[in-house]
Amino acid sequence: MTHFENASIQKTANVYFDGKCISHNLTLPDGSRKSVGVILPATLEFNTGAPEIMEVLAGQCRVTLADAPASQTYEAGQSFNVPGNSHFTIEVTDTLHYVCHFG
């Protein structure tokens, strides 16, 4: 899917980690929530409330999930799951474009 139909989009950007991660929230007609954004080169740790599926649209990243013995690499066309009430570390060397699917 290259776009979302009839989405309600938050106009103000979410800016995290001094601008290293920038996203916009959107809600689809069925009530599902997503964020679409970019992560600039950095190593960042994110905490989750709800479960997330991180879909990589462009770029590449190394991800270490909480309690995982090793990191894994993901690139465009791949995704990874993060449990709710957890955390993960993501290392990005070139700009990463992503969609985060919540819940």
From Swiss-Prot:
Gene3D superfamilies recorded: Jelly Rolls (2.60.120.10)
EC number: 2.4.2.1, 2.4.2.2
Taxonomy, superkingdom: Bacteria
Any one GO MF annotation of this record: thymidine phosphorylase activity
One CC-aspect GO term: cytosol
Function: Catalyzes the phosphorolysis of diverse nucleosides, yielding D-ribose 1-phosphate and the respective free bases. Can use uridine, adenosine, guanosine, cytidine, thymidine, inosine and xanthosine as substrates. Also catalyzes the reverse reactions.
Family that this chain belongs to: Belongs to the nucleoside phosphorylase PpnP family.
UniProt name for this protein: Pyrimidine/purine nucleoside phosphorylase
Annotated organism of origin: Laribacter hongkongensis (strain HLHK9)
